[in-house]
Design a protein with these regions (language model features):
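Jelly-roll (double-stranded beta-helix
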Residues: 1-272
Length: 272
């Protein structure tokens, strides 16, 4: 897969030798795809049968899938370990059950779920049998340390999201330690969602790695080094990956935008 780029010429000022700074656009159509009778999944990084050695992760983000699942179907029980899993539900309702509590939990649209796999957990995820199925974005990050007890939590943020301000969904950053956001056992990462009206502007965090995914609508990133018509617009399913160049802004298009933003203050090894 070859990403389309909306980035300036790589800067020589990166603190990671060989890693270009600036903004790179990865288009929705460049994602890997897995399609079955019950699932349509788009993978931003290598996943399952799809492998690109140049696109295995970004920062601490190991997986970023957008899944559409038909009613009553889904992922049967399967194992995870040493992974922090965050799921954002866009449409419909997701049913989740794990081996920790055995309790069936439902996550509605506008809801976020965290599953800390710890030393090992088994879980299942299905669309509710009624309705039109479910669409969600699932994201994995590496934890600070392996092992530990599995954990699970759900939060509905549909109300705060409607206000148009950024809502922190899950975080391990010290500045969020006393807040009501879902925990993340990765002290260098946080996930935020913002729903913007037409023409509204939001700032992106100043962090070594920023991943901004447009889940709905469209948005145009601030690219001072490429002013005018050459600035790339991000449509639904597109993502901006930004390295060592934080503090940019995004302006929503005429239909508004819903954007998921990862702020990461570390990466895996020396690479992106």
């Amino acid at each position: 897969m070859t990403p389309s780029t909306g980035s300036p010429t790589p800067s020589t000022g990166s603190s990671r030798p060989g890693v270009p700074t600036g903004l790179t656009v990865h288009r929705a159509g460049d994602r890997f795809r897995t399609a079955t009778r019950w699932l349509d999944s788009r993978h931003s990084f290598s996943a399952g049968a799809h492998y690109d050695p140049a696109n295995t992760h970004f920062g601490l983000l190991l997986l970023h899938n957008e899944d559409v699942v038909v009613p009553g179907r889904g992922y049967d029980e399967h194992p995870h370990r040493d992974t922090e899993i965050v799921t954002w539900v866009l449409d419909g309702e997701l049913e989740h059950r794990d081996s920790g509590s055995g309790e069936l939990r439902r996550v509605p649209a506008g809801g976020v779920q965290w599953l800390g796999a710890g030393r090992g957990v088994r879980h299942s995820e299905h669309a509710t049998p009624s309705g039109d199925g479910v669409r969600f974005v699932q994201m994995w990050v590496v934890p600070d340390e392996p092992g530990g007890d599995p954990g699970h939590a759900v939060r509905d943020v549909a109300g705060p999201l409607a206000a148009g301000e950024p809502v922190v969904l899950a975080s391990g950053l010290a500045r969020h330690a006393d807040s009501t956001v879902l925990p993340l056992r990765q002290s260098m990462a946080a996930l935020t969602v913002v729903r913007l009206g037409p023409g509204a502007v939001t700032g992106l965090p100043a962090a070594p790695f920023v991943h901004a995914f447009v889940a709905r609508g469209s948005a145009t990133p601030e690219v001072p080094e490429r002013p005018g018509p050459d600035v790339p617009e991000l449509g639904a399913g597109d993502a901006a990956r930004i390295v060592d160049d934080g503090g940019r802004r995004l302006t929503a298009g005429r239909d508004g935008a819903e954007i998921l933003v990862w702020e990461m203050h570390s990466g895996l090894g020396a690479g992106p």
